[in-house]
Amino acid sequence: MAITRRSFLKGVATTSAASIIGPSLLTSVSAQAAETTGTWKVSGSHWGAFRAHIYGGKVQELKALELDTHPTEMLNGIQGILYSPSRVRYPMVRLDWLKKHKYSAETRGNNRFIRVTWDEAIDLFYRELERVQKQYGPWALHAGQTGWNQTGAFHNCTAMMQRAVGMHGNYITKVGDYSTGAGQTIMPYVLGSTEVYAQGTSWSEILDNSDNIILWANDPVKNLQVGWNCETHQSFGYLDQLKEKVAKGEINVVSVDPVKNKTQRFLQNDHLYINPQTDVAFMLALAHVLYTENLYDKKFIETYCLGFEEFIPYVLGKSKDKVEKTPEWAATICGVKPDAIRDFARMLVNGRTQLLFGWCIQRQEHGEQPYWMGAVLAAMIGQIGLPGGGISYGHHYSGIGVPSTGFAGPGGFPRNLDQGAKPKWDNNDFNGYSRTIPVARWIDAILEPGKKINHNGNTVTLPGFKMMVISGCNPWHHHQDRNKMKRAFQKLETVVTIDFSWTATCRFSDIVLPACTQWERNDIDSYGSYSGKGLIAMHRLVDPLFQSRTDFEIMTELTRRFGREKEYTRGMDEMEWVRSLYDECKKANEGKFAMPEFEEFWEKGFLDFGTGTPWVRHADFRKDPEINALGTPSGFIEITSRKIGRYGYEHCQEHPMWFEKTERSHGGPGSDKHPFWLQSCHPDKRLHSQMCEAEAFRATYAVQGREPVYINPLDAKAKGIKDGDLVRVFNDRGQLLAGAVLSDSYPRGVIRIEEGAWYGPLTEKVGAICTYGDPNTLTLDLGTSELAQATSANTCIVDFEKFRGEVPPVTSFGGPIEVI
């Protein structure tokens, strides 16, 4: 057998580079226009809606849909995804798995694959489902990994996979997600809903009524570039207005953040530096000032809250650790001077104050605490339910805060079996294991099967599953501690991945099936996840490249293997499904929105329902807390949760508290050995790991072909590092290479590598360096607490040095090493 590193043009006979990639990556747009005519088609994406110029069966050019007045530059990366050298082109099977089956786990990750036919691949997939259900039972199959997928109401790859696999047999699934695992678990106890995915007070109400806006670990200018559905970018119009008000001194905006983030640089607002992972200590001191100086809203606390009298003794040092949470106490932890803490507390109650929290601070050890304590602060300020006051946990996400029109978006493909239907293997014996596990504890399950953990008031017994099915999801991006993952994956017998790009998850799989991108199929999607601005027709722009197929086609073929394909499809093809979803949507909106017949909508490409009515979160509760009670056990804001207290957890008790971290920079545990905090926040130029494969767009920010690591110039100088140097970042969990970018936006002791950088190990061995710069090579795989058991990615300290020696090639991109 010959072994060659796959190049993009390999195996494509009698074609030129231009005919495969499309001229837009090789020639200028003006040159294309001179030689082509073609057609324009409307489609959409997480990055926004656009019109695509199609000529010769290829996408030549993209331009933002005219409704989007603030398009993101990431639209420039879409062609790079579609025509990426990292596309999964054919069904592939890992060579050693095919030769030795499960006994080859030690070579998993060596990226050596052999091409097979579609029939062979589906047969192998089905054979493994049969073997696992027969040999072990449903506890041995995990099909619950989920992610952002691609946009589109019909082609939801997770739903399509889980319906097909569920028709065959039961399986292990998950609860929660990586983005907001701690927040969505704690907030129902405190404010009665997850809050993180709830519509927030309209931006117009904030702009008209707020005197102070606190952006707490929140970077909306960066994060609002993308959306769960097709993004409208309406939020940026409000941010433009906010910038004007900041410049005129009409609104006081403060960013509480270790770094000067993109939003702070855009708004030119005040920045309050705080040591990483110390927000709760800072907030407790703020509460101390508000209470001892009698600045808090006593009437609001008495009318709308429960448990303040149990919480305040902790602040005063009369319970629990018996330490008074004074500004002097907090200053030694958070790095904010005592008088600055006092001034900040007084500012919070000087006028109408809107707290806007981001998600990063709940992705750390004890991540439940800052969100809970934020709600306590908002309650003490007393403005929850007022225009321009209170607290939000989502104004950086998917256009939350843009007034909703009330449009009911289209439904989707059914995830579950039809009512009354049973799977082929109707076995509900999970061998004493839990059927559902916390989303971030699946690696622990593989490594420690049978281990019992606490989770949200229940006991979970981790299942030692043997097989995974992963569809349109990249856990080798979003989970923590790559070397721990390598050890776990050596225990798995079979991993099947369905995707359009050859991610690290494909590298560590056994069977890889090529799905097509969202621009190679037909669909519809809501335009605006929360605003309900309209509906987008997602036209297929080009035919599926290589041998890729839609998830619908792939899973239909799988169900055909056990005679359930008609039940799976309900007798409809792609366009019949799309039409039916549109017609159901039209019926659901009768009397509210005039929607044309499907053909007219499909030809036009979009519907625009305008802007909705401004709204204030929790206003009804404030107006009448008895009639409009919250969803908490008491119906009130629970400063103290007696329900959580009854759980008896060590790391999440009955009210918010300061807990020291397992590791922390700036004088915290472990900082003598690894003194730098690694911030691995959402990227500025990707959606998580989506678009990292777009070569031309990646080149606009990569440094020597690697992911950037952002470093304070003084920290870099101390280590002999200049802008553009290669840097080795390391701790006891792993090591990576990244390209240095020096910036005063980052304080001493803090570095940033944005998550979503594709993992590219030099070898499959445990401990191998990541050649591109995936920060999760270094992060800690630890549950936030017994309550949420969510990811603690931002509890991570490291060291770094200038890289010396022979520079290894980047192994993240370009697909497998194909054995022929």
From Swiss-Prot:
Binds 1 molybdenum-bis(molybdopterin guanine dinucleotide) (Mo-bis-MGD) cofactor per subunit. Keywords: Metal-binding, Molybdenum, Oxidoreductase, Periplasm, Signal. The keyword NAD does not apply. Coiled coil: none annotated. Its cofactor is Mo-bis(molybdopterin guanine dinucleotide). It is found in: Periplasm. Its EC number is 1.7.2.3. It catalyses: trimethylamine + 2 Fe(III)-[cytochrome c] + H2O = trimethylamine N-oxide + 2 Fe(II)-[cytochrome c] + 3 H(+). GO terms for cellular component: outer membrane-bounded periplasmic space. GO terms for molecular function: electron transfer activity; molybdenum ion binding; molybdopterin cofactor binding; trimethylamine-N-oxide reductase (cytochrome c) activity. The keyword Metal-binding applies. Residues 1-33 form the signal peptide. CDD domains: MopB_CT_DMSOR-BSOR-TMAOR. One of its GO terms (biological process) is anaerobic respiration. Predicted to be exported by the Tat system. The position of the signal peptide cleavage has not been experimentally proven. Mo-bis(molybdopterin guanine dinucleotide) binds at S179. InterPro entries: Asp_de-COase-like_dom_sf, CT_DMSOR/BSOR/TMAOR, Molybdopterin_N, MoPterin_dinucl-bd_dom, Mopterin_OxRdtase, Mopterin_OxRdtase_prok_CS, Prok_Mopterin_Oxidored, TAT_signal. Belongs to the prokaryotic molybdopterin-containing oxidoreductase family. Reduces trimethylamine-N-oxide (TMAO) into trimethylamine; an anaerobic reaction coupled to energy-yielding reactions. This is Trimethylamine-N-oxide reductase. It comes from Vibrio cholerae serotype O1 (strain ATCC 39315 / El Tor Inaba N16961). The lineage of its organism: Bacteria, Pseudomonadati, Pseudomonadota, Gammaproteobacteria, Vibrionales.
